[in-house]
Amino acid sequence: MRIDLLTREYPPHVYGGAGVHVTELARVLRSLGPDIRVHAFDGPRKPGDEGALDGVRGYDELAELDGANAALRTLGVDLQMAAHTDGTDLVHSHTWYANFAGYVSKLLYDVPHVVSAHSLEPLRPWKAEQLGGGYRLSSFAERIAYENADAIIAVSNGMKDDILRSYPSVEEDRVHVIFNGIDLNEWRKPSTEDEKANQARVLKEFGIDPDRPTVVFVGRITRQKGLPYFLRAARQLPRDAQIVLCAGAPDTKEIAAEVDTLVKELAADRDGVVLISQMLPRTDLCAILDVATVFITPSVYEPLGIVNLEAMAMELPVVGTRTGGIPDVIVEGETGYLVPIEQKTDGTGTPIDPEAFESAMAERINAVLADPGQARQMGKAGLERARTEFSWDTIGQQTLDLYRALVG
C-alpha cells in the first residue's frame, strides 16, 4: 500500500507541532510496512539534509507567483504536489497549507483523502492580520477539504468538537480521534557527559540559573499561544522565580511589538527574565527544560499542544489553559493544573475577563512553585502518562488501521 503524506513542514524545515507530527508519523509508518511518500514545501531536500530520504519530495513556490499573496503561492505548491501523487492508494494532508493538494488528488485519481486537523481556520481569525485577503482563501481550502474528506483525524476530543461545530455538514462518524505523540527516546534528561557539557554551555550562554525556581514557556509568538497573558500574569509570581521564554517567529509585526514591550516591562521590574528568540535544537531545549520547575501553556486556542507532551516527557508539571485539547493532556491535580477561562465566541478565543484569566494562571503556577515535592510527583506522573497514552507506536498503528479501512 502506497501512502502519500502532504505537509507544509518536514525536516529540515520544521517550525511547529504539525511538522513534528508528520515527521514522527512518517517514521513509524515506514516501520510498519507501507510505501510512504512525503510531499513538502520549502524546496527539494539536498543530500545530507535531515529529511533527505527516498520518497521525500520538496517543492519550491512557482516563480510565476513571486510577489503574489502568500495564500495564493501556497495553492501553487499544492497543485504541484497533486501532479505527483498519481499512483498512490491514499493521500493524507496536514494543515490548510496542504489540504487543497489532498482534495485535488482525490478528484484527479479517485483515491481516499484523509485530513489531519492540527488547527482550524475559523478559530484563528487573527490570521487575517498575516494573510489579508488570503485568509478567505485559506479558509476556503480548508472547508472544501474537510467537507469532502473520506476521514478526518482530530488530534484531541476538543478538536473533534471544534470540527463538528465549525463544519456542521461533516458527519460525526467521519471524524476519528487519534492523539499526537511523543518520542521518549528523544525527549529525555541529559545523562551522558556530552549532554551534560552541552547543558552547561546552554545555561551559560543564555544566563539561566539552574538553582532558581524556573517557569518555562516554549512557543511561537502568535495570538493563539497567549504569551501576552502569561507575561502579565508573571507580575504576580514570586520575585525569586526565573522566567525563561523560548519564543520567536512572530506571525505579525503587531504581536511582535506587543510581546517585545511586555517583556521589556517585565524585565525592568524584576531580574531573571530570559528571552530566547531563535529556534533551539531539541538537545538545547532539553537542557533548559531539565532545570525548569514548571511549564506554562497560556494558549487561547490549542488543538492538543505537542509542547505539553515534550514537557511531560521531561518530568515537568504543566499549567495550561482549559481550552481545546489541553484537557486531554493535563490531568488536573495529578500532572499539573488547568487554568479556567471564559472565552468570546467570535472565533478569537479572547478571554472575556483577561485579568481573571491572568490571575488564575498565576495562582496555579504559584501553587506548583510553592510545593517542590508535589511538583516532582506531578512531573513523574506526567512522564508516565506520556509513556502510556501518547506513544508514537500506538498512534502509528491506529493511523494505519484507518488507512486500511478506507482502502479496503
Positions of the model-derived regions?
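N-terminal subdomain of nucleotide-sugar transferases
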Residues: 1-47, 408
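A conserved mid-protein helix/loop that constitutes part of the nucleotide-sugar donor-binding site
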Residues: 20, 213-217, 222-236, 257
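Nucleotide-sugar donor phosphate/pyrophosphate-binding loop at the beta->alpha transition
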Residues: 111-112, 122-144, 161
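Carbohydrate-associated surface elements
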Residues: 158, 181
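Nucleotide-activated donor-binding/catalytic signature segment of Leloir-type glycosyltransferases, i.e.
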Residues: 256-279, 283
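Short alpha-helical donor nucleotide-sugar binding micro-motif in glycosyltransferases
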Residues: 286-292
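Aromatic "clamp/platform" in nucleotide-sugar-dependent glycosyltransferases that forms part
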Residues: 300
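Short hydrophobic beta-strand element within catalytic cores of glycosyltransferases
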Residues: 317-320, 330, 337-338
